Amino acid sequence: MLPQEIVYTKLSSTETQNGWIDFLTTKPLASQGIEWTPLIPTAHVLSIFMVLFMIAILTAVYYTKLKKLKPTEPPTGYVLVVQLLILQFENLTVDLLGEKNRRLSLLFIIIFVYILISNLMSMVGGIAAPTSSSTVTFSLGLMSFFGTFIMGVKYQKLAYFRDFFVIIKIKKKTIPLMINPLNVIGYFAPLLSISLRLWGNVLAGSIFIALLYSLFRTFFTLWSPSSFSVGLVFGTLAGGLVIPAFHVYFDILVSAIQAFVFVSLMLTYWSQPIKAAENAAEEKGQQMIENQRLNVK
C-alpha cells in the first residue's frame, strides 16, 4: 500500500455536508481494508526495478562519458560529480575499515545511490518509494548485520564469539560459563535501529506530504460546498504552490541525509570488530614487551 493511500479518501459532496465534523471523524484506515498479504507483489516491487534500471542508466552514462574523456582532459560535469563521490567514499572506507578494505567503497557507493534514488521516488506521484517498505529497509539492515558478523570472524576469529558468553578464569584459562543475553540482544539492536530509522523517516515524510495535499483539498472543498469540483481544483492548485517547499526538505534534503547516515552507520558497525582486533593485538604486543622487560631484570 502506498503511503498516500493511507491518507487519501474519496471525497464527495455528501461527505462534506456536515463540514469539519465529518472530516475529523473519518477513519480512512478502516475503509481501506488493510490486511497482510505476504505472497502478493506490492507497489514497491515495481519501484524497486525502476530504481535498479535508473542506476544501470546512470552507470552506463558515466562509463560512456569516461571512455570519451581524454587522459589529459580534466573531468567535468557528471563525471566530476561521480569521481568526487567515489573519492569521498574511498577515503571514508579507508579511514574506518583500513587500506585493505578499500575495494568495499564500491559497495557503499551502490548502497548510498540505491537508498538516495529510492527515497527520491516518493516525489513521483503514484509510485511508492522502496524505502517506505519495511521489507526493503530490513533487507538493507541485514547486509549491515551479516557484514558485521563477517568482519568479526575475519579479524577476531573465535575471539569474536567471546562477547556472547559470560567468561570465567580458572588457573589462567578462560572458560565460557553461559550465554550473555544482554550482549546477544545488543548484537541484534543495530539491525533494528538502522532498519527502523530509515523506514520510519521515509514513511513519515511520505505520509506528511500526503496529509498536506489532503488538507488543502479538503479545506477548499469544505469552503465551497456548493461547487465541489471548483473547491477541489483550487485546493489542488493551492497545494501545488505551497507544498513544493516541503518537498525540497522531506524528499530531497532528508533523502540525501538518510542515505548518508545509513552508509555511515553501516561503516561504523563494520569497523567495530576491526578496531577490537587492533586493540587486542596492541595489548598483546604491550604485554609481550612487558614480559621481556621482566625477564631481563
Swiss-Prot record:
Record Gene3D superfamilies: ATP synthase, F0 complex, subunit A
GO biological process: proton motive force-driven plasma membrane ATP synthesis
Residues spanning the signal sequence: none
Family annotation (InterPro entries): ATP_syn_F0_a_bact/chloroplast, ATP_synth_F0_asu, ATP_synth_F0_asu_AS, F0_ATP_A_sf
Membrane-traversing stretches: 38-58, 77-97, 107-127, 133-153, 174-194, 202-222, 230-250, 252-272
Subcellular location as annotated: Cell membrane
Record keyword Nucleotidyltransferase present: no
Major site of localization recorded for this protein: membrane
Keyword Membrane: yes
Membrane topology: Multi-pass membrane protein
GO molecular function: proton-transporting ATP synthase activity, rotational mechanism
GO cellular component: plasma membrane; proton-transporting ATP synthase complex
Keywords recorded for this protein, A-Z: ATP synthesis, Cell membrane, CF(0), Hydrogen ion transport, Ion transport, Membrane, Transmembrane, Transmembrane helix, Transport
Family, as annotated: Belongs to the ATPase A chain family.
Oligomer status and interactors: F-type ATPases have 2 components, CF(1) - the catalytic core - and CF(0) - the membrane proton channel. CF(1) has five subunits: alpha(3), beta(3), gamma(1), delta(1), epsilon(1). CF(0) has three main subunits: a(1), b(2) and c(9-12). The alpha and beta chains form an alternating ring which encloses part of the gamma chain. CF(1) is attached to CF(0) by a central stalk formed by the gamma and epsilon chains, while a peripheral stalk is formed by the delta and b chains.
Function: Key component of the proton channel; it plays a direct role in the translocation of protons across the membrane.
Protein name: ATP synthase subunit a
